[in-house]
């Protein structure tokens, strides 16, 4: 005769393994999606850095030429 507790534990262990495999697949897909998002955000970050550098250069130029005016 088989031990009913052993059968129950085996069934539970099988369910746990199945759920962990599904979780692993979901996390793998999430990581891939995050990589794609990060790659697409690189262009936005670059444009932001360029704009900040441009604004800093314009401010420096206006201060040096004494044409910087107070905000309205």
Curated annotation (Swiss-Prot):
Keywords: Cell cycle, Cell division, Centromere, Chromosome, Chromosome partition, Coiled coil, Cytoplasm, Cytoskeleton, Kinetochore, Microtubule, Mitosis, Nucleus. It holds the Pfam family DASH_Dad4. Residues 15-35 form a coiled coil. InterPro entries: DASH_Dad4. Its main location: nucleus. The keyword Iron does not apply. GO terms for cellular component: cytoplasm; DASH complex; microtubule; mitotic spindle. One of its GO terms (biological process) is protein transport along microtubule to mitotic spindle pole body. It is found in: Nucleus; Cytoplasm, Cytoskeleton, Spindle; Chromosome, Centromere, Kinetochore; Cytoplasm, Cytoskeleton. Component of the DASH complex that connects microtubules with kinetochores and couples microtubule depolymerisation to chromosome movement; it is involved in retrieving kinetochores to the spindle poles before their re-orientation on the spindle in early mitosis and allows microtubule depolymerization to pull chromosomes apart and resist detachment during anaphase. PANTHER family: DASH COMPLEX SUBUNIT DAD4 (PTHR28222:SF1). Belongs to the DASH complex DAD4 family. Component of the DASH complex consisting of ask1, dad1, dad2, dad3, dad4, dam1, duo1, dad5, spc19 and spc34, with a stoichiometry of one copy of each subunit per complex. Multiple DASH complexes oligomerize to form a ring that encircles spindle microtubules and organizes the rod-like NDC80 complexes of the outer kinetochore. DASH complex oligomerization strengthens microtubule attachments. On cytoplasmic microtubules, DASH complexes appear to form patches instead of rings. This is DASH complex subunit dad4. It comes from Schizosaccharomyces pombe (strain 972 / ATCC 24843).
